[in-house]
């Protein structure tokens, strides 16, 4: 454990030794090209490329304007030329392939710069890698050249030769032969320090800017800008070439003895950039400090009072140089900024009336560029809808269209996206100074979640109620009945239809069997049945001599009674009942004839032909061997039987036949008729009425007769 601590400190020391390096993980080679929008930065070969088997292809894109130059300086570049390559490409130059460090910095003008590092892989040799720094700045001129204010470079011999070689007159400004005699001459660049400039505009530069002169000791210079006007001053540094350790500071106010207020500090990181500083008052102090043996040229700057333009510039607005811009020193524009596709004026004066576009339209790019042929209307600018291919209509927006919000980076987004919890501007300025508010996504998720929870709650309540109802129903089966429920459940059933007819509650229906509610015996049921049969067999009934069609069940019952011999068959002549010799006594036909007319309710009569039905057979016990001799001695028929009512005999016969048919096993043979002397005693019908009316059953197989066939309705 102790031996690992020194190694840990060494690793931390190595990581902190170069904190300015920007390292890229291995994923930078596998993802899409990395876009670098910073003004300056550092690049090195991606770490983690220790594996020599797999190839690599890493790409970085440095965003830049077409009027800027990207300067690349190599601190280290050692690649294996056969297997590793570093390619730099810009729109205005052919690709540059490197495997060794160049002699000096590379200047790549024209806009975006693409840097590509490739490795062949397959265990090919690898170099030590590369380390470079880049910066976006204006094009720097050589030491023997003069840099114009419009960033052009001309030979130093063309300075103050009476010819406008720069195109903006900056090479002739401050000379004895000023091309603008009607204007106050601008002071010529001077090598003196600690000067006070009191004009409304002017040009000043550091000592040795026009010619490089290194000194062996540090230098310090001050310039006091006091045009004696209360309006603000705009100080613009058109060229910067500072060495390491050199610095330029801009203060607000007149300086000592007053405490100055620092507005801006410029170092070698600002080299090649055009920097504009606006004061808070009508005075400013510019200080310049160099180190010994400084290799930097210094700076070149101009100043003017807000509301005025330099003689070689044009005003953005109408009138005496007053423009509509609210930015620093941009109420004027130079000839080089005319029709370049970038709005330097807030109202687009520098891009209005350019060749190739109709009146009221603005070009997407400068002449000679791919976007120069496309033109757009003012309504298409700064509305968060890109019209130009390179997005020139959405850059440097001073004002946005209605319904849009202007970001601090001079871009526009929809106004509804402001303070919604999600940054839409590049710098996130649309979420600054916002009161606490939940994002739309959180609110939407909360609403959807609440709806889902409410739906689940309703389903849960429905299931709970259903289960409770089922459980309550199960418990109610075993629960005792209440008095009210018992009264409802135990109510007496309503009377039947036949009982209502018998009680006289409703009128009787023809051919419907009535019953006495107080007579539920078998005898009463048989009487009702015989009444139906009597009505059916009565000639000339209520139907006017025509027999009514009976129900199927009644017709079947009548056929069975006829088959059993309980009813006479129709259209059959009456015959005397056959008597069993020496066994069954017969009833004389005269007695039956006499009793036919006296038949009361419940008797059976013949059909329409008026024939008399045969008497019912009398059931006698089966003779036994002990009774055979006694019966054999009887040679004469018994005397006449006593007069028995036909109804009683018929009912008795029906009951006996039903009992013999349905209950053969329960019937014990015995004498039905008892002889006392010369006559037979018949059992009382009341003794045979105490039977149950059981459903008709057919334990035996009956022979189907012709009468069993169903009648046609």
Curated annotation (Swiss-Prot):
Residues with Phosphothreonine modification: 596
Disulfide bond annotation, renumbered to this chain: 29-58, 81-99, 141-153, 148-166, 160-175, 193-221, 309-332, 316-345, 339-354, 357-375, 364-388, 382-397, 400-412, 407-425, 419-434
UniProt subcellular location: Membrane; Membrane, Coated pit
Domain of life: Eukaryota
Ranges in the topological domain labelled Extracellular: 18-441
Side of membrane Cytoplasmic, spans: 463-713
Gene3D superfamilies: Low-density Lipoprotein Receptor (4.10.400.10), Spermadhesin, CUB domain (2.60.120.290)
Glycosylation sites: 57, 112, 194, 300
PROSITE patterns, per the entry: CUB, LDLRA_1, LDLRA_2
Disulfide bond keyword on record: yes
Transmembrane segments annotated in the record for this chain: 442-462
Example of a GO biological process term: inner ear development
Name of the protein in its database record: Low-density lipoprotein receptor-related protein 10
Organism name: Mus musculus
Lineage of the organism: Eukaryota, Metazoa, Chordata, Craniata, Vertebrata
């Amino acid at each position: 454990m102790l031996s690992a601590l020194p190694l840990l400190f060494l690793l931390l020391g190595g990581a902190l030794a170069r904190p300015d390096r920007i390292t890229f993980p291995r994923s930078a080679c596998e993802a899409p090209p990395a876009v670098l929008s910073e003004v300056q930065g550092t690049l090195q070969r991606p770490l983690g490329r220790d594996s020599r088997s797999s190839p690599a292809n890493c790409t970085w894109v440095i965003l830049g304007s077409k009027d800027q130059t990207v300067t690349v300086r190599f601190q280290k570049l050692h690649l294996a030329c056969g297997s590793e390559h570093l390619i730099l490409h810009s729109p205005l130059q052919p690709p540059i392939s490197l495997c060794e460090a160049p002699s000096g910095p590379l200047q790549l003008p024209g806009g975006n710069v693409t840097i590509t590092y490739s490795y062949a892989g397959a265990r090919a040799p690898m170099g030590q890698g590369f380390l470079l720094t880049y910066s976006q700045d204006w094009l720097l001129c050589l030491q023997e050249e003069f840099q114009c204010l419009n960033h052009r470079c001309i030979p130093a011999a063309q300075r103050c030769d009476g010819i406008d070689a720069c195109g903006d007159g900056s090479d002739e400004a401050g000379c004895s032969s000023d091309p603008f005699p009607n204007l106050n001459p601008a002071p010529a660049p001077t090598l003196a320090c600690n000067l006070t400039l009191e004009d409304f505009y002017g040009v000043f530069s550091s000592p040795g800017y026009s010619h490089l002169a290194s000194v062996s000791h540090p230098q310090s210079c001050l310039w006091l800008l006091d045009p004696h006007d209360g309006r603000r001053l705009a100080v613009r540094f058109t060229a910067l070439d500072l060495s390491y350790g050199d610095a330029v500071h801009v203060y607000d106010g007149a300086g000592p003895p007053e405490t100055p207020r620092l507005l801006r500090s410029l170092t070698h990181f600002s080299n090649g950039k055009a920097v504009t500083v606006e004061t808070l008052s009508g005075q400013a102090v510019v200080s310049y400090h160099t180190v010994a043996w400084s290799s930097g040229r210094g700076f070149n700057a101009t100043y003017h009072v807000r509301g005025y333009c330099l003689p070689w510039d044009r005003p953005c607005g109408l009138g005496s140089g007053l423009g509509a811009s609210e930015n620093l020193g941009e109420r004027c524009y130079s000839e080089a900024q005319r029709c370049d596709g970038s709005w330097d004026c807030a109202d687009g004066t520098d891009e209005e009336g350019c060749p190739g576009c109709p009146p009221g339209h603005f070009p997407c790019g400068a002449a000679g560029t791919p976007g120069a042929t496309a033109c757009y209307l003012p309504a298409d600018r700064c509305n968060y809808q890109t019209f130009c291919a390179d997005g020139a209509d959405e850059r440097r927006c001073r004002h946005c269209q209605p319904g849009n919000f202007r970001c601090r980076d001079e871009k526009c987004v929809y106004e509804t996206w402001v303070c919604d919890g999600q940054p839409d501007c590049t710098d996130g300025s649309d979420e600054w100074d916002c009161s606490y508010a939940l994002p739309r996504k959180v609110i939407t998720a909360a609403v959807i979640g609440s709806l889902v929870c409410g739906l689940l709650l309703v389903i849960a309540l429905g299931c709970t109620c259903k289960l409770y109802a089922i459980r309550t129903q199960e418990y109610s089966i075993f629960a005792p009945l209440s008095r009210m429920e018992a009264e409802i459940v135990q109510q007496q059933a309503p009377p039947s239809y036949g009982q209502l007819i018998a009680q006289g509650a409703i009128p009787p229906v023809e051919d419907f069997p009535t019953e006495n509610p107080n007579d539920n015996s078998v005898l009463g049921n048989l009487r009702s049945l015989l009444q139906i049969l009597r009505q059916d067999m009565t000639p000339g009934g209520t139907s006017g001599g025509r027999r009514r069609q009976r129900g199927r069940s009644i017709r079947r019952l009548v056929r069975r009674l006829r088959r059993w011999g309980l009813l006479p068959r129709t259209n059959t002549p009456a015959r005397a009942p056959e008597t069993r010799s020496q066994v069954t006594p017969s009833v004389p036909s005269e007695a039956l004839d006499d009793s036919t007319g006296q038949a009361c309710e419940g008797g059976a009569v013949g059909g329409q032909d008026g024939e008399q039905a045969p008497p019912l057979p009398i059931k006698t016990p089966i003779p036994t061997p002990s009774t055979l001799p006694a019966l054999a001695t009887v040679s004469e028929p018994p005397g006449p039987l006593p007069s028995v009512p036909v109804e009683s005999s018929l009912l008795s016969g029906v009951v006996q036949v039903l009992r013999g048919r349905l209950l053969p096993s329960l019937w014990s043979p015995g004498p039905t008729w008892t002889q006392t002397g010369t006559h037979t005693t018949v059992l009382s019908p009341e003794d045979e009425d105490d039977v149950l009316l059981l459903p008709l059953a057919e334990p035996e197989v009956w022979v189907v007769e012709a009468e069993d066939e169903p009648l046609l309705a």
